[in-house]
């Protein structure tokens, strides 16, 4: 099977490439000319430089590729940006880049049998944030454990068919890309909307590890927050389960199937890193918003993309990140192997091995 992975040099993209190689697929890694290839060292990888801003150039490139080896059977579109100094960049990269990619594949007569798009749970915005009180926690896997017991579940999960109400430029751009994909003639698409993805090589969650190492753990807002995560390898497994089954015209929400409070991630990092004496601070939302606004403004003058910005503020402000993954469980036999503790332990071990901490 011939497979193209866009954004292959990125966090998720590099793991997608590794999985495809493990499955003995013929892999093309779509990268920018300036992209680091640090995590793409396998000699079996075919590299193809993609300028997603230029539909005509992509069309010529894909037409040439088709002449050489035929069309790709599967295209996984993982390229995109999660933060930027300027709002319009999200739409230029995440939406217009997707449009250029699909149009170029069509124009070159190289439409794949399956086009996998990595979207985001952020397309929904802040939904279902009204308290519902005590509730029997659902267990999508039908196994024993902490799920299935009575506990305080404040919010109902976000469901696939909920109407997206994105409240960030990032979420809006991903929703716009989805809308284009769904109406594209001849495109056999499947869409994944993962919650927060963490693991080795990822740098945003790594900032929390740096903070813990400095003996400070931050939480934001005083209203209870229900958070979900998915370890990168579990997300990748879900993607390839869809590829194996030839799934098309389907959308899947992806998490590890569990729900955590705002302190769990920091506590697990602290335990895995062996850090003692951590001060836990809860920052009021108005202070967070002010800090994000200042950082965003400063970034426009320094030319650097800040980690904190008003988009990030809206994401951190959101209280409900629960999501219903039952479709993936039923249709893809999705069984995540990593709960948060196992994933954090493996991630911290990688941080230490790579001397990030």
Where are these regions (language model features)?
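Mid/C-terminal beta-alpha module of Rossmann-like enzyme folds, strongest
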Residues: 245-307, 341, 345-346
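Glycine/proline-rich active-site loop of Rossmann-fold NAD(P)-dependent oxidoreductases
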Residues: 128, 175, 187, 198-207, ...
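NAD(P)H-binding glycine-rich loop region in Rossmannoid oxidoreductase-like domains
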Residues: 50-96, 100, 121-129
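N-terminal Rossmann NAD(P)H-binding glycine-rich loop of SDR-like oxidoreductase domains
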Residues: 3-23
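A conserved pocket-lining segment of Rossmann-fold NAD(P)-dependent short-chain dehydrogenase/reductase
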Residues: 161-164, 210-230, 234, 238, ...
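Amphipathic terminal alpha-helices
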Residues: 323-331, 335, 339-357
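Conserved C-terminal active-site "lid" loop/helix of NAD(P)H-dependent oxidoreductases
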Residues: 232, 267, 293-334
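Conserved Rossmann-fold NAD(P)-dependent oxidoreductase catalytic core, especially the SDR/UDP-sugar
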Residues: 77, 99-169, 190
């Amino acid at each position: 099977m011939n497979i193209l992975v866009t954004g292959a040099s990125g966090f998720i993209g590099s793991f997608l490439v590794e999985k495809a190689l493990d499955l003995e697929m013929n892999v093309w890694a779509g990268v920018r000319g300036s992209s680091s290839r640090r995590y793409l060292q396998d000699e079996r990888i075919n590299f193809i430089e993609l300028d997603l801003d230029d539909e005509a150039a992509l069309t010529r490139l894909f037409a040439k590729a088709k002449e050489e080896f035929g069309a790709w059977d599967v295209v996984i579109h993982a390229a995109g940006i999660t933060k930027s100094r300027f709002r319009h960049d999200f739409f230029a990269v995440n939406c217009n880049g997707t449009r250029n990619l699909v149009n170029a594949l069509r124009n070159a007569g190289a439409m794949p049998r399956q086009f996998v798009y990595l979207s985001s749970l952020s397309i929904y915005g802040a939904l279902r944030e009204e308290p519902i009180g005590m509730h029997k926690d659902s267990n999508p896997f039908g196994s024993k454990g902490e799920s299935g017991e009575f506990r305080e579940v404040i919010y109902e999960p976000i469901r696939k068919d909920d109407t997206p109400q994105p409240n960030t430029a990032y979420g809006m751009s991903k929703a716009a890309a989805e809308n284009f994909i769904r109406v594209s003639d001849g495109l056999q698409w499947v869409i994944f909307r993962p919650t927060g993805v963490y693991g080795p090589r990822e740098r945003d969650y790594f900032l929390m590890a740096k903070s813990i190492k400095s003996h400070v753990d931050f939480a934001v807002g005083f209203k209870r927050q229900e958070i979900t995560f998915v370890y990168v390898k579990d997300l990748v497994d879900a993607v390839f389960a869809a590829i194996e089954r030839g799934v098309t015209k389907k959308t899947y929400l992806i998490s590890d199937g569990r729900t955590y409070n705002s302190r769990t991630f920091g506590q697990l990092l602290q335990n895995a890193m062996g850090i003692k004496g951590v001060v836990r601070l809860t920052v009021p939302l108005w202070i967070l918003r002010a800090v994000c606004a200042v950082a965003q403004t400063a970034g426009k003058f320094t030319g650097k993309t800040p980690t904190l910005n008003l988009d990030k503020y809206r994401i951190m402000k959101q209280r409900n990140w629960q999501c219903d993954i039952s479709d993936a469980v039923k249709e893809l036999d999705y069984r995540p192997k990593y709960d948060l503790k196992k994933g954090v332990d493996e991630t911290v071990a990688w941080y230490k091995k790579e001397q990030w901490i």
